[in-house]
Amino acid sequence: MIIKEAKDAKRGRVHSRIRKKMEGTPERPRLNVYRSTNHLYVQVIDDSKGATLVAANTLEFGEAKEGKRPTGGNLSAAKQLGKAIAERAKQKGINKVVFDRGGYLYHGRIKALADAAREGGLEF
């Protein structure tokens, strides 16, 4: 069984390899995804300026149970997040992005987020 530290270290190595080849420009900024245990965080980043242009996370959309933080680690929250990031990017005049999956497999929540962002009008 692979322990969590080993999995995370492997993902970090994959992500650094991907980042060497990928760069967000003002014309096509980078759509970066971070997946925690309970939430997803998405940013549209212009790497030439080193600035975050648009950001969203599932903390904004999850349903909170009594006395607890909202949950956002599921497919429905990922779909809502994809639509929200696409809408916010379009408001800033961003239509095309480069998708940076952050070393995560293109499966599950990451795939749902990407598909929803495409449905929302982002091209990648």
Swiss-Prot record:
One of its GO terms (biological process) is translation. The keyword Phosphoprotein does not apply. InterPro entries: Ribosomal_uL18_bac-type, Ribosomal_uL18_bac/euk. It holds the Pfam family Ribosomal_L18p. SUPFAM superfamilies: Translational machinery components. GO terms for molecular function: 5S rRNA binding; structural constituent of ribosome. CDD domains: Ribosomal_L18_L5e (cd00432). Gene3D superfamilies: 3.30.420.100. GO terms for cellular component: cytosolic large ribosomal subunit. Coiled coil: none annotated. Keywords: Ribonucleoprotein, Ribosomal protein, RNA-binding, rRNA-binding. This is one of the proteins that bind and probably mediate the attachment of the 5S RNA into the large ribosomal subunit, where it forms part of the central protuberance. Belongs to the universal ribosomal protein uL18 family. Part of the 50S ribosomal subunit; part of the 5S rRNA/L5/L18/L25 subcomplex. Contacts the 5S and 23S rRNAs. This is Large ribosomal subunit protein uL18. It comes from Koribacter versatilis (strain Ellin345).
